Curated annotation (Swiss-Prot):
Belongs to the PC-esterase family. TBL subfamily. This is Protein trichome birefringence-like 14. Its main location: membrane. One of its GO terms (biological process) is xylan biosynthetic process. Contains 2 motifs that are conserved in esterases, but it is unlikely that this protein belongs to the catalytically active pectin esterases. Keywords: Membrane, Signal-anchor, Transmembrane, Transmembrane helix. The keyword Transmembrane helix applies. GO terms for molecular function: transferase activity. It is a single-pass type II membrane protein. The lineage of its organism: Eukaryota, Viridiplantae, Streptophyta, Embryophyta, Tracheophyta. May act as a bridging protein that binds pectin and other cell wall polysaccharides. Probably involved in maintaining esterification of pectins. May be involved in the specific O-acetylation of cell wall polymers. GO terms for cellular component: Golgi apparatus; membrane. It comes from Arabidopsis thaliana (Mouse-ear cress).
């Protein structure tokens, strides 16, 4: 008797379960069912999130867009870190429309910079910039960004820890190092325009000639690499005959002066040096597992109608007159840096193409005065020197740092 009732009960439960399943299916396939829409939305968000996390953002492709929150700091107030020659507001530039744009990468979002978040992320870390004056601009930009462009007496000058002190008779030290004590974050810059090791050839007369060892990274980098958590390298604009001869640099490889014609070609010497320093650094990275290394591509020049010393200028003041977008294979990527870091653990910080669009953001004629001729009687007029190499700050190097921070 009890077995029969049990069988009937199980049959009723099974029938009810089947009916319930059918109702759920009908609800899910109904186009007007809100539950269906919610489930599909969850699935879409999950898929989108998975896709974003699995793909690598190419920050070099994208477009410049207007942003009323710019600039990130004041060119008037960041005097503690910013050289006056690069502060176009201090130097009297009358137009500042170039400040009101940010870079929007294609297909991904670049986090909005927040100095407190940045310093917290960089707690107990050291960020080092090693390169030429454009590297120094990026360093000063990051100091202004991290301090909010405000005087920060609590920030400590720790240059002495890295041997960055002004030598007797020098105009300035070879670099600077500052520490934010609240997070123990150190940001430093070392001047090495060629990223090669420079050694006086005559110790009794150091200014005479300097051996430029193309196959050796700067001694500063070799000596302090173990203290860095993040490293950004750059070189480029000192690789010309005038700079090398003017600095009395004599190129060396394997400890001996270069004799072959191949490396006497400045372009080949530059290519050789960049590949050499990248190869050396990549070999060091396994020994310093916490170190993240970047090689920044070259910053473009925008001289027209001549060069810096022949009346060249970049007097355009209209933002984005060259266009606003970099897509596909557009751009002028630094092929030498790209080749050097290919297959290494070093990341490329590609800023060339996006900076190429911003010719109006250079210092131009805001800074430099006309050159004084040696003999006025021999010169009827002296052209104004325009700076179409360096950038106004605040300005384009702030964007370089945003791309850099997004990739740390």
């Amino acid at each position: 008797m009890f077995g029969g009732k049990s069988h009937i009960l199980r049959g009723s439960v099974s029938l009810a379960l089947i009916v319930l399943i059918l109702l759920v299916i009908i609800l899910l396939v109904s186009e007007e069912n809100p539950l269906r829409d919610s489930l599909f939305e969850v699935k879409r968000q999950f898929s989108s999130s998975s896709s974003s996390s699995s793909s690598v953002c190419n920050f070099a492709k994208g477009k410049w867009v207007e942003d009323r929150k710019r600039p990130l700091y004041s060119g008037f107030e960041c005097k503690q870190w910013l050289s006056s020659m690069w502060s176009c507001r201090i130097m009297g530039r009358p137009d500042f429309s170039f400040e009101g744009y940010r870079w929007q990468p294609e297909g991904c979002n670049m986090p909005q910079f927040d100095r407190f978040t940045f310093l917290t992320r960089m707690q107990n870390k050291t960020i080092a910039f090693i390169g030429d004056s454009l590297g120094r601009q990026q360093f000063q930009s990051l100091m202004c960004m991290a301090s909010g462009g405000e005087d920060s007496p609590e920030v400590q000058n720790v240059g002495w820890e890295y041997g960055l002190v002004k030598a007797k008779g020098a105009l300035r030290p070879d670099g600077w190092a500052y520490r934010f004590p609240t997070t123990n974050t150190t940001i430093l810059y070392y001047w090495s325009a060629s990223l090669s090791d420079l050694v006086p050839m005559n110790n009794t007369d150091p200014p005479s000639l300097t051996a430029m060892h193309l196959d050796r990274p700067p001694a500063f980098m070799r000596n302090y690499l173990h203290r860095f958590d993040v490293l950004v390298l750059n070189t480029g604009h000192h690789w010309n005959r005038g700079k090398i001869e003017g600095n009395h640099w004599v190129m060396h490889v394997n400890g001996t002066q270069v004799e072959g014609e191949y490396l006497k070609d400045i372009r080949n010497a530059k290519d050789f040096t960049i590949h050499s320093v990248a190869k050396w650094l990549d070999a060091q990275l396994p020994l310093h597992p916490r170190l993240k290394a970047f090689f920044r591509t070259i910053s473009p020049r925008h001289f027209k109608n001549g060069d810096w010393n022949t009346g060249g200028n970049c007097n355009n003041t209209v933002p984005l007159s060259r266009g606003s977008e970099i897509t596909g294979d557009d751009g002028s990527i630094d092929a030498t840096v790209e080749s050097a870091v290919n297959g290494t653990r070093i990341k490329i910080l590609d800023i060339t193409a996006l900076s190429e669009l911003r010719d109006e953001a250079h210092i131009s004629g805001s800074k430099l005065k006309p050159r004084k001729p040696k003999k006025a009687s021999n010169v009827t007029s002296t052209p104004t020197i325009n700076d179409c190499l360096h950038w106004c700050l605040p300005g384009i190097p702030d964007t370089w740092n945003e791309l850099f921070i997004a990739q740390i």
